């Protein structure tokens, strides 16, 4: 009922297409004795983080990537965590790996991320790889921004010349997404906004594409959207009843031309491009 008019940007169907391609590429790598391996480092027993990690390894099984898990207690020291990362850096079976965030408060997240071998940075969030993105040099790309761009292209949403309003300034989505969209291969014009931006509805009504990644429940409403615009819902938070919701209000479906559901939109592609980063590195190593 709420989705009258808008075309669904279906992340699950798009992910499945990517997985078919990845499975063929992993089969070829395995035949050459170069099976990719994805490592995960999980600290503590947060149910959400555990579920995310389980999902990533289930994805690995679907395409033939080896799983390497390092599950650590919540009270682990910074030194022991860094030793675990050093071990994965040196492990030839580990093509790439991620540190599941957030870490417990007594641990230094930035120090952990910087300890990852940039070549094994499956999330594309190492400072060196983010710097390469700024310089437009080849490197692993952040998974969620890459997934957003792929999803828009898959449904033929015009990016070149488009005015894109990104709401959210986090390092995992907002900041790197602006860098991706302004490359010559995308050629979008990006306005980066956040929860303290003045006159936000006025800005979003001028957008061809809105990316909502602020983590504020239902902050983007129909009144903020130009008819026919594409709206991508990335934010995840809980409403007053404790239910997981996105940043986009359901009434947006009645106005927009394209909308990504949440869940089922960008999330599946974040995981798909995590595996893609690992497979691409395995192919590069095999080629060298």
Swiss-Prot record:
NADP(+) binds at residues 168-170, 195, 236. Gene3D superfamilies: Leucine Dehydrogenase, chain A, domain 1 (3.40.50.10860), NAD(P)-binding Rossmann-like Domain (3.40.50.720). Pathway: One-carbon metabolism; tetrahydrofolate interconversion. GO terms for biological process: L-histidine biosynthetic process; methionine biosynthetic process; purine nucleotide biosynthetic process; tetrahydrofolate interconversion. It comes from the Bacteria. This is Bifunctional protein FolD. GO terms for molecular function: methenyltetrahydrofolate cyclohydrolase activity; methylenetetrahydrofolate dehydrogenase (NADP+) activity. Belongs to the tetrahydrofolate dehydrogenase/cyclohydrolase family. Catalyzes the oxidation of 5,10-methylenetetrahydrofolate to 5,10-methenyltetrahydrofolate and then the hydrolysis of 5,10-methenyltetrahydrofolate to 10-formyltetrahydrofolate. Its EC number is 1.5.1.5, 3.5.4.9. Signal peptide: none annotated. It catalyses: (6R)-5,10-methylene-5,6,7,8-tetrahydrofolate + NADP(+) = (6R)-5,10-methenyltetrahydrofolate + NADPH; (6R)-5,10-methenyltetrahydrofolate + H2O = (6R)-10-formyltetrahydrofolate + H(+). Pfam families: THF_DHG_CYH, THF_DHG_CYH_C. Keywords: Amino-acid biosynthesis, Histidine biosynthesis, Hydrolase, Methionine biosynthesis, Multifunctional enzyme, NADP, One-carbon metabolism, Oxidoreductase, Purine biosynthesis. The lineage of its organism: Bacteria, Bacillati, Actinomycetota, Actinomycetes, Mycobacteriales. GO terms for cellular component: cytosol. Homodimer.
């Amino acid at each position: 009922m709420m989705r009258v008019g808008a075309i669904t940007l279906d992340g699950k169907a798009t992910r499945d297409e990517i997985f078919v391609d990845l499975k063929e590429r992993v089969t070829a790598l395995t035949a050459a004795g170069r099976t990719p391996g994805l490592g995960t480092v999980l600290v503590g027993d947060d149910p959400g983080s555990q579920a995310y990690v389980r999902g990533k390894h289930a994805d690995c099984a679907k395409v033939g990537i080896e799983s390497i898990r390092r599950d650590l207690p919540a009270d682990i020291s910074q030194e022991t965590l860094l030793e675990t990362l050093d071990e994965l850096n040196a492990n030839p079976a580990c093509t790439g790996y991620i540190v599941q965030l957030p870490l417990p408060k007594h641990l230094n997240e930035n120090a952990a991320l910087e300890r990852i071998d940039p070549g094994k940075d499956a999330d594309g969030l190492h400072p060196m790889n983010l710097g390469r993105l700024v310089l437009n040099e080849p490197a692993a790309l952040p998974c969620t921004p890459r997934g957003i761009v792929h999803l828009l292209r898959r449904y033929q949403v015009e990016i070149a010349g488009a005015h894109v309003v990104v709401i959210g300034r986090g390092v995992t989505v907002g900041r790197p997404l602006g860098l991706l969209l302004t490359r010559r291969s995308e050629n979008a014009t990006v306005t980066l906004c956040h929860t303290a931006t003045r006159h936000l509805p006025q800005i979003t009504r001028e957008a061809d594409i809105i990316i909502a990644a602020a983590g504020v429940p239902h902050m983007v409403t129909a009144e903020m959207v130009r008819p026919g615009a594409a709206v991508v819902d990335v934010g995840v938070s809980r409403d007053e009843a404790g239910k997981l919701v996105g940043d986009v209000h359901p009434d947006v479906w009645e106005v927009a031309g394209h909308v990504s559901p949440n869940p089922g939109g960008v999330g599946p592609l974040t995981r798909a491009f995590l595996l893609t980063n690992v497979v691409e590195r395995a192919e590069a190593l095999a080629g060298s």
